[in-house]
Amino acid sequence: MNRTASTEEGPLVLGIETSCDETGIGIVRGTTMLANVIASSMEEHARYGGVVPEVAARAHLEALTPALRTAVADAGIDLAAVDAVAVTSGPGLSGALMVGVGAAKALALSLGKPLYAVNHLVGHVGADLLDADGGPGHPVELPTVALLVSGGHTSLLLVRDLVSDVELLGETIDDAAGEAFDKVARLLGLPYPGGPQIDRVAAAGDPRAIRFPRGLTKPQDLERHRYDFSFSGVKTAVARWVEKRQDAGEEVPVADVAASFREAVADVLLTKAIAACLDHGVPRLLLGGGVVANARVRQLAAERAAAAGVELRIPALSLCTDNGAMIAALGAQLIMAGHEPSGLGFGADSTLPVTDVHVV
């Protein structure tokens, strides 16, 4: 079993995260989180029923400097004292990424500090290094399978080494799980963001009321897409079910639909994640991403992991959503492992593969 480095006296790293709609500035020393400031533009996107890339980029421009000032104050440090700057260079929304990358380059250049461009998805794995209350962090035990689920990504990773050996086992071939939650919420007349709304309404529903399809779980699908996900089918099935009831003049049982949809998504996510653990002989599963806030996903993960004899790791919910502290933590791991900084020649890469943990 391998472990990531863990030390309270590690490098002091400032992390910048702007891959989607949350502006994150985090400061860590080794694996100890000193500050984690998140400014969300969710309310602005709610008017449009989803994330608008141009709105997200503009919001990052407005939020970065205030968030940076707050993070430095929270950490109780002088900005010049940081040892390095780390930034998400991808994957994500191009315009949003450019704001963070540009700010990180300017900051690193003005401070005369090394800059590390890192992968957003691997950053979610790095979140497990941190204690949300600011206490000493802890190592990530490796190898681990990581299930990362958000509005923009649904990915299954095999992490043998956090900074040098990350394999993509599978990902969504259409909608991300979080995106499907948003679209189904809209069908049910629920506001954006859909995930929390469906979770709230589903609590009063029967998850067995309607059997919605589980994408890419049939035997013929598993041959080619054993670890891949598909949520467009279940989204369409919900739409047709609701439309049929409405056309018949019947009342739509929103709570039952929400609970049944939530159950279908959670079932697929955990079926494939546990299968990946067992197939690869990996005794632990790490969850990350905003959809991990879903109560049924967490509950089913605990049930399936216990039944399979797999250790389940879930960072604090404040660290599961996009944040700068996880980026800083990954940057610190790169430094402690002796990796070279990125320099200033890299750019934002909206399709950065997960195998590229660090862009040089």
From Swiss-Prot:
UniProt-listed Pfam families: TsaD (PF00814)
Record protein name field: tRNA N6-adenosine threonylcarbamoyltransferase
Organism in which the protein naturally occurs: Leifsonia xyli subsp. xyli (strain CTCB07)
SUPFAM superfamilies documented for this protein: Actin-like ATPase domain
Cofactor annotation: Fe(2+)
Subcellular location: Cytoplasm
Catalytic activity: L-threonylcarbamoyladenylate + adenosine(37) in tRNA = N(6)-L-threonylcarbamoyladenosine(37) in tRNA + AMP + H(+)
Enzyme class: transferase
Positions contributing to Fe cation binding: 120, 124, 322
GO biological process, alphabetically ordered: tRNA threonylcarbamoyladenosine modification
Co-factor: note: Binds 1 Fe(2+) ion per subunit.
EC number: 2.3.1.234
PANTHER family listed in its UniProt record: TRNA N6-ADENOSINE THREONYLCARBAMOYLTRANSFERASE (PTHR11735), TRNA N6-ADENOSINE THREONYLCARBAMOYLTRANSFERASE, MITOCHONDRIAL (PTHR11735:SF6)
Known role: Required for the formation of a threonylcarbamoyl group on adenosine at position 37 (t(6)A37) in tRNAs that read codons beginning with adenine. Is involved in the transfer of the threonylcarbamoyl moiety of threonylcarbamoyl-AMP (TC-AMP) to the N6 group of A37, together with TsaE and TsaB. TsaD likely plays a direct catalytic role in this reaction.
